[in-house]
Amino acid sequence: MSVDAFSRESDDMMSLLDYDFIEGSSSDENAEVTEMETSAKTANNKNEVLFAPPCTQELLTERPSPDSKNSQGDDDSNSIYGNVIRDAQHSASRYATRCLDNAIPRKRLRLANLTVDSACISQTKRPHGTGNRKQYHRRNFPMSPTSQEKIHLRLHNRLGSRSEKQQRSLNYDRRLQEGHHRRRFYSERRIYDQNHSHHRTHDIRVPLEKYRVSRQHDLPVHEELNEILQREKHRLASISNECDFRVSSKNRWAAVLTFSSNAESTLCGPQITWEYLLHAGPELRNTFEIRPRISLQASAAREAVLRGESFIAALGSAEETLSWLKLHAVLKLRLVNHDPIFKTAGAVLDNLRLKLAPIMMCKYGTEKRSMGDMLRRSAPEDINDSLTLCLILLSRIRRVMHRTSGSKYSYMIDPRGCMIDYVPGECMTNILRYVDAHTRRCSDPACNLYISCTLMPIYIHGRYFYCNTLFGM
């Protein structure tokens, strides 16, 4: 054999790896080749079609051939990495055939194409010692474009346009610049807290300047306080002149409807009978109804008086409220929203609770439900004596007047109709009997002294000194 023939045969053997078999005509389902070309120009494309999985002609034409201008590497590189390509193609075809029979053919096609494309990318562009193994696989075996776009979109929606590998908090750079990450000593931290109010520690030693009010006039303290008292006195006098129900002198309630700034004026009002109240009560109610603005101011003045009453006076105010409720129940009148008597029922209740709480605690202790629990429920079923009747009805009046909108009637407060048979003065009499019975049975001298001072509000003992360095009394 000549040398030329030997060299020609060796060249043909070395170029077999780059041969490709291109179908000249259409093939059947078994991929049988009907016409093949074995020219040297199409040798590279024949090898690719032979091992590629079944796919459309459009995908085949998109792959660049080694003879094109975009192809990289020479014949030596193709021969060196030819085994890698064949192994990748064989593994892709074997993986596609191992899929389930009912799997989607397009899924098998996509998996095989991704494997072959990744092998081609690794052949043409190989990193040289850059990054770790995870970065190497991410760069050379990327995900599908659809999945990659979804991941970038998800990260962009969460963290903005940051593209670092380790996504940090958006406030990390700001905290790093301000020095929040560094530990400080006590002296340095104290100076830092003074400059940063939102990190300032709580100091129990509050300076007195925080509670001091700036003085408007350079006057002595006693003159300044006298000026304050005189100003309030003039204000009350002006209010008493402006606040007037404007009733005629023939009105039977004209004496008690006037506003007076005199401290010696009577607070209990005239003593009347139930028959007189039943006859003249609707006139007082109509006065409250047609004068809503003055009635609201009268409620404020009345509440200030009721909260400072003694125990006996508080019982009288409770009797006034219950008798007024009985009038509405008997005559079936609608309750006025700005009625001063009903509006101040809560003040009467609070004063009675304050006076009766030590007595009830001494009598019942923890054996019975507390007064707060009973009033929180305010159920008509809990009424069993005059004391519970008075407290529960006052609580229900306050609740209805403040929480119920629209028309209000007496049956909303007293659903059991206890006020129909109620005798005015009954609650006050029975509560005083209740307190006196406890005094005779209780062996605690402190409780007996408290009851005596409550029933007769005369100063006996309790105040030891009056400290005031600003002015003298």
From Swiss-Prot:
GO cellular component, one term: host cell nucleus
Region (Disordered): 57-81, 123-143
Chief place of localization: host cell
GO biological process entries: regulation of DNA-templated transcription
Molecular function GO terms recorded: RNA binding; zinc ion binding
Domain of life from the UniProt record: Viruses
Pfam families: Herpes_UL69 (PF05459)
CHC2-type ZnF: 362-447
InterPro entries: ICP27-like
Sites where the protein binds Zn(2+): C362, H438, C442, C447
Record key words, sorted: Early protein, Host cytoplasm, Host nucleus, Host-virus interaction, Metal-binding, RNA-binding, Zinc, Zinc-finger
Subcellular location(s) of the protein: Host cytoplasm; Host nucleus
Protein family (similarity comment): Belongs to the HHV-1 ICP27 protein family.
Functional summary from the UniProt entry: Multifunctional regulator of the expression of viral genes that mediates nuclear export of viral intronless mRNAs. This immediate early (EI) protein promotes the nuclear export of viral intronless mRNAs by interacting with mRNAs and host NXF1/TAP.
Quaternary structure and partners: Associates in a complex with RNA, and host export factors NXF1/TAP and ALYREF; these interactions allow nuclear export of viral transcripts.
Protein name per Swiss-Prot or TrEMBL: mRNA export factor ICP27 homolog
Organism in which the protein naturally occurs: Gallid herpesvirus 2 (strain Chicken/Md5/ATCC VR-987) (GaHV-2)
Lineage: Viruses, Duplodnaviria, Heunggongvirae, Peploviricota, Herviviricetes
